[in-house]
Amino acid sequence: MSDANTPAPSSAAITSGVTSEQSLVDWLQTMPEVDPSSPSRLPGWSVGHVMTHIARNADGVLSMFSGLHQYPHGLDGRNADIEAGASRGWSELVDDVVSRSRAVAAAIAGRADWTGTVHMLPGERPTAQVPLLRQREVEVHRVDLGFGDEFADMPADYVRRDLRLMEMLWTSRKPMGMTTLPDAALALDPPTRLAWLMGRVEVPGLDPAGLF
C-alpha cells in the first residue's frame, strides 16, 4: 500500500496516542489484582491472553520501526507468544504491559519520519497509520478486558479518527455505488458505530459489519 495519500500524524494525534498509553499504565497500576484466567470479552481469550497481546503488539510496533516485520515469526509465532504468556501471574502481566507501553509511547513520540510503509501481519501499511493503529489496540482491548471500560469512555478524538478509517474500510469492501453506511449505522452515536464496525456490539436492524 502506498503512503502517498497518507499524511503524517498530527502532533495532536501523537499526543493522544501517548496519553492513551499513559492512561493504560496508570489504570493497570492502580487496579486490584485480577485472576488472569478470568474470561475476557473476546471469545476463547482470558484476561491473560488480552494483556499479553497488548504487550506483544507494542513489541510489534518497535519491530516495525526497526525495519522488521511486525511479528517476525508470522501468525503462528504471534499466537504461540500469546499462549505462552497468558498463564503468567497478574503482577508479571502488568509489569510486561507497563514496560512495553512506555517503550512504544517513547518511540512514537520521538519519531520524526513518518514516510514509507511498514510490514504488518496483514501486509504493507503506511508508517503514518501506526500511531492510530496502536492507539486502537490500547483503547479497544481495554474494553475487551472486561474491567468496566466501554467504547463510550474512549477519547473522542481517537473515536473520530478511527471512525474515518473504519468507515473507509467498510466502503472499500462493498460493491461500487454503495458508498455510505446504512442509515441505521449512521444514526448511532460515534462510539457505538465504531463498536459495531469492530464487531464488538450487535445492533438491532443491522447485520454485522463483517470487517474482522
Model regions and ranges:
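Basic, Lys/Arg-rich alpha-helical nucleic-acid-recognition elements, primarily the DNA-binding modules
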Residues: 1-42, 49-52
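Structured surface interface patches that mediate subunit assembly and partner/cofactor docking
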Residues: 2-13, 63-70, 113-212
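A short small-residue
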Residues: 2-4, 77-85
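A structural signal for well-ordered alpha-helical segments within the folded catalytic domains
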Residues: 18, 22, 48, 55, ...
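Structural signal for well-ordered, non-membrane alpha-helices
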Residues: 21-29, 58-62, 98-112, 139-142, ...
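Helix-loop segments that flank and shape redox-cofactor active sites
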Residues: 25-46, 67-71, 110-123
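Conserved alpha-helical segments that form or flank metal/cofactor-binding pockets of metalloenzymes
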Residues: 47-76
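A short, structured beta-strand-centered segment in the mid-to-C-terminal lobe
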Residues: 81-100
